[in-house]
UniProtKB/Swiss-Prot annotation:
It catalyses: nitrate + a quinol = a quinone + nitrite + H2O. It is found in: Cell membrane. This is Respiratory nitrate reductase subunit beta. [3Fe-4S] cluster binds at residues 160, 181, 187. GO terms for cellular component: periplasmic space; plasma membrane. Its EC number is 1.7.5.1. Optimum pH is 8.2. At 40 degrees Celsius (temperature of natural environment) the optimum pH is 7.9. [4Fe-4S] cluster 3 binds at residues 148, 151, 156, 191.
Amino acid sequence: MSTDSDAETVDLADGVDHQVAMVMDLNKCIGCQTCTVACKSLWTEGGGRDYMYWNNVETKPGKGYPRNWEESGGGWKSSEHKERKPGQIPDKEDYGDAWEFNHEEIMYNGSDRPLRPDSDPEWGPNWDEDQGTGEYPNSYYFYLPRICNHCTHPSCVEACPRKAIYKREEDGIVLIDQERCRGYRYCVEGCPYKKVYYNATQKTSEKCIFCYPRIEGEGPDGKTFAPACAEDCPPQLRLVGFLDDEQGPIHKLVEEYEVALPLHPEYQTQPNVYYIPPFAPPQHSEDGESVDVDRIPRNYLEELFGERVHDALDTIEREREKVNRGGGSELLDMLTDTNPARKFRLEVFDDD
């Protein structure tokens, strides 16, 4: 747990008043894809967006979506954010085409053939779902939900020669000005997480907008709502708020307890989507006895979340032991809280 002053630990981008952020607890994700469906039905149902999944849930270890995105480059060469790393634009096949199925044949023409894609797909956004690694009985996998990270130092912003991508002053959300964008795709190349997508129909790039109309209360009833992916999540694994809200769970999990970590911090973009790293049962010996070895290798988690993952897991384990002995834990209370008013703190700076 950090002992530094809270105000000194929050790094906001230049010109940004507050930074909205999300924490996802990977120990709760069941891979149900409800978040994916919520996002897809709200934002990317057609008009050149068929292949886009602004929110997707990957099985790790796995190649992800788009395929092998972790090997596609992009980001910054150092924390000084002066020189970008070269990146690649994924091929359409790496995303996977939107599948068309023989629904009409089955449902209206009385065919005995099974329901299947009309095409012969070779990849898709959830192609390697539930494919674990390791040897039985110590094989493992876990789910990794991903959206745009709305980074503090987004390399996509710097990559755009049209200055069409920007961070909003009021909340740090990264958006693309569709009037300025010309579809050059330097942003796709520059994003190391490959969370910017090219719309070949509109000839512009598009991405997750953190459901800003929902958090602004632009619905018919004027109420503020969390992003659809967070609001609709059955196991309630997502917390949403502001990184600089010192009383909120986002700030405490990221800055105080330091158990919520960014994905691939070595990309140097400083993401504002954070993850509680996953636990798993211990490994078993050949005779079926539990052994004191992590089933999910710590070195693999370090590849994803950096060297701080060891301290984060140790901190959570200490808090669990404290509760097992009959004590209390603010940390575990935050991670198990189901009250929307505390999980989604989006109106704390409305009077600014």
